[in-house]
């Protein structure tokens, strides 16, 4: 049997993989209440169909820190901060594409249910701020839809309440 990592006992679960299908995270428990991790995701093209914006696609990766009020591997209230780098691609009704990239910061509060089979369900919500700048554009017409794409990204730069749901397995 391998020796425990960083002072853990043999029965402690230090790692967890969590997913919401389009978002995945791998975390390491620093102690009973604190965890750090890496997350990544890709949200496939989402139909917007508003103000000449047809679809929005996002991809991102970054780091997270979690604090559980009782413990990471038990039923507990929690706060998680996410810092990530990402990109967004907007497609307008004329087929033009506009690519944006930058960073984002989110703080989520919620509750985690931890089951005896090492499965956890995490539910929460919190604000999201992102700062993405236009990197490139592939214009198909002269109808000026780039302005509509910029306005859509501006609307998404601060979202006051973003839902958060993950299912995880600790090991």
What label would you give each PLM region?
Residues 13-15, 20-22, 55-61, 99-105, ...:
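Residues that define the transmembrane beta-barrel architecture of outer-membrane proteins
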Residues 12-16, 41-49, 82, 92-93, ...:
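Primarily recognizes Gram-negative and organellar outer-membrane beta-barrels
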Residues 25:
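Short, surface-exposed charged micro-motifs
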Residues 116-171:
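Predominantly the C-terminal beta-signal and adjacent terminal strand-loop region
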